[in-house]
Amino acid sequence: MKKHLFALAIASLLASTAFAQANDTIAKVKASGSVTMGVRDSSGALSYTLGDGKYVGYHVEICQRIIDNLEKAAGKKLDVKYTSVTSQNRIPLTENGTVDIECGSTTNNEARQKQVAFAFTTFVEEVRIAVRANSGITNIAQLNGKNVATTTGTTSVQLLRKNERATGVDFKEVFGKDHADSFLLLESGRADAFVMDGQILAGNIANSKAPGDFKIVGEVLNVEPIAIMFRKDDPAFKKLADDTIAALAKSGELAKLYDKWFVQAIPPKNTKLGLTASDATKGAWANLNDKPVEAYAKK
């Protein structure tokens, strides 16, 4: 009996130790010699691919700065690996340790905070509507009877439903597996509109075959804090990420990175999104925080 209890105690200790290590990113990457960044294929200027395994963008570059400091904390150079994630799998892959830091376009909300942790907000998004330029659609009320695209696993799905109930507009939702797929639904005529984060819409329009064929219209549907995501219960890594962002904000480098990706010409086509930082984004930089979207709604 004593041997059995001793074995159970050892097993419990090993399990708790393994759990602690799984949530200790600094220890994890120090032991493995590598860190995995979760990136997106088409999340506007926040995170996108150039092909051949190359990923760039505002959040990708901020994550690279965080990883620079992670290497200092680990005391070694790390092999940086990239894993393409989607709106559906980004949280599970972060939770299970496949991804160490997710650098895409994830909205910080209360439900997600129960599963993962977020760094200080680095971008405050405005949810908008993209349509074909010749559609005649200028606001959400004109979507009655239309097919409206959004991306599976994003908060825009809930937002669409709330607007449908609030305004009495009866539209059919069609879902893309990722943002590029959702834009393709609009581009091909299978959807009459695409509702998503404004910079994602602008990025997909800018990189389309005929940017002049599309436009962003209507009122701002919602304001959402977008942040870099990682595992919960890892205070040391959260502090490292937050301290990195705080230093970038204090030095003015964060504003320069924003200008680089949202105002200036970006690869691969040297297109310009021309999206100057909103007052909400500047406010997030001035008063760094990790508040969820619900806190913004209460204002």
Features from the language model and the residues they span:
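Extended ligand-binding regions for polar small-molecule ligands
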Residues: 61-69, 141, 146-147, 152-154, ...
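Ligand-binding clefts/hinges and TM-proximal coupling segments of bilobed small-molecule sensing domains
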Residues: 30, 158-174, 212-214, 246-299
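Bilobed "Venus flytrap"/periplasmic-binding protein-like clamshell domains
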Residues: 36-45, 55-72, 107, 125-179, ...
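Extracytoplasmic small-molecule ligand-binding "clamshell" domains
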Residues: 22, 28-102
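A ligand-binding cleft/hinge motif common to bilobed small-molecule-binding domains
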Residues: 89, 104-114, 159-166, 185-188, ...
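Acidic, polar ligand-binding/catalytic clefts
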Residues: 64, 75-142, 283-292
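Short beta-strand-to-loop elements that line the ligand-binding cleft
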Residues: 74-86, 170-178, 218
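Periplasmic-binding protein-like
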Residues: 41, 123-134, 206-245, 264-289, ...
